[in-house]
């Protein structure tokens, strides 16, 4: 029996991927896209980036809920301006690419994202850096659905509660722009909404499990696991093509 073209084994794998990705995002503050995009793309490129990003709204809403007083709306404004420009360029570039090349493109962008995450860059938190990194993040997100590494570098060392809340709203803004532009470009429709719904059970389970995982595991070990999963998934995409 198939559901939207996916069999029981694939649906189980999708759920497990979203559980792991959600737990890492809730614990570390970043990493949802780095984990889910390459692994979901291995199952089916039709799950990324649109359906995966649409489902991710649930995770980001959970991050913001109860922590909205930590959000710096001025920083969100600077970020939104950069995201708008970068996302538009990324989506336009994506529409010009042969779909058969997308798995390798996603794999390459994921490896770039991992490289940025471990690069040791030190960027101060100011309007210029937020805007510039948001343009780059928007471009990467428009192409692959992975926005995070550079803006995460800008927020390194900040209060964890502020990071979770502010970046949670930042991702909501980024994802809303991405989905809107994919709709305008004809790359997101009703079938994608159905695919996004397939990801929600794993998100719900992951949100419930996150506090227990955070108590049992060190954040740095989770971060290392996140990067290892992302690299493995990217290599499979590059080899599989």
Residue ranges of model-derived segments:
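Helix-loop interface residues and adjacent transmembrane-helix termini in multi-pass membrane transporters
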Residues: 42, 70, 96-99, 157, ...
């Amino acid at each position: 029996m198939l559901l939207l073209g996916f069999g029981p084994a694939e649906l189980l794998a999708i759920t497990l991927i979203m559980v792991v990705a959600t737990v890492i995002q809730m614990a570390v503050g970043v990493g949802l896209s780095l984990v889910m995009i390459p692994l979901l793309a291995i199952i089916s490129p039709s799950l990324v980036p649109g359906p995966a990003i649409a489902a991710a709204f649930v995770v980001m809403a959970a991050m913001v809920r109860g922590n909205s007083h930590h959000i710096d709306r001025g920083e969100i404004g600077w970020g939104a301006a950069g995201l708008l420009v970068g996302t538009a360029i990324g989506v336009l570039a994506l529409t010009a690419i042969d779909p058969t090349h997308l798995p390798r493109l996603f794999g390459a962008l994921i490896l770039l994202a991992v490289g940025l995450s471990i690069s040791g860059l030190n960027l101060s938190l100011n309007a210029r850096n937020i805007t510039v990194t948001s343009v780059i993040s928007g471009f990467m997100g428009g192409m692959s659905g992975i926005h995070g590494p550079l803006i995460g570098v800008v927020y390194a060392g900040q209060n964890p509660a502020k990071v979770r809340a502010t970046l949670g709203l930042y991702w909501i803004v980024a994802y809303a722009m991405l989905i809107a532009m994919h709709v305008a470009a004809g790359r997101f429709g009703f079938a994608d909404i159905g695919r996004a719904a397939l990801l929600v059970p794993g998100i719900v389970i992951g949100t419930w499990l996150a506090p227990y995982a955070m108590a049992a595991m060190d954040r740095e070990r989770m971060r290392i696991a996140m990067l290892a999963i992302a690299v493995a998934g990217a290599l499979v995409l590059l080899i599989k093509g």
